[in-house]
Amino acid sequence: MARYTGPTWKISRRLGISLSGTGKELQKRPYAPGQHGPNQRKKLSEYGLQLQEKQKLRHMYGVNERQFRRIFNDAGKMAGIHGENFMILLESRLDNLVYRMGLARTRRAARQLVNHGHITVDGQRVDIPSYRVKPGQVIGVREKSRNLQVIKESLESNDFVPAYVTFDADKLEGTYSRFPERSELPAEITEALIVEFYSR
């Protein structure tokens, strides 16, 4: 399944979460898109709930189904709780950490920065959004990209960097200090439902 590249507003409203991180999608119309949107929220089956939870998390991180399943399988090989490990691996993606550091307003914008070669890891250019960053690695902006307007605007509007990431706005670089705790990850996701979905 290819990654969805269309408008995120409809997906956000259908799933009941803000994929952009701004919350604007749900402010005016907190219901699914369509003529009968307000009446479309119906009780889902157990399978429907599991599928919806999977779609929420997959769209939140902007990952296609093949990548999503591969990360899920990798998480199952780790010690600890499968669902939590899964979310930690998603959070460890390079595009996500660029977003978390405030270098991009959305994960989609962060993915573009990585794809276009503007981002470095430990001083080396990395243009793979799915690159799995390890704790202790340093993420930065290439010298020739430091004056990009999109980065400046994003940093000006960002006022929060999670505790598991450090960021130096003057150097335009940050460190993935440690793996996040579950309490620091999206609370609107019930990852146990996703584990159940793939265990069917």
From Swiss-Prot:
GO terms for cellular component: small ribosomal subunit. SUPFAM superfamilies: Alpha-L RNA-binding motif. Keywords: Ribonucleoprotein, Ribosomal protein, RNA-binding, rRNA-binding. The keyword rRNA-binding applies. InterPro entries: Ribosomal_uS4, Ribosomal_uS4_bac-type, Ribosomal_uS4_CS, Ribosomal_uS4_N, S4_RNA-bd, S4_RNA-bd_sf. Part of the 30S ribosomal subunit. Contacts protein S5. The interaction surface between S4 and S5 is involved in control of translational fidelity. This is Small ribosomal subunit protein uS4. It comes from Halalkalibacterium halodurans (strain ATCC BAA-125 / DSM 18197 / FERM 7344 / JCM 9153 / C-125). The gene is rpsD.
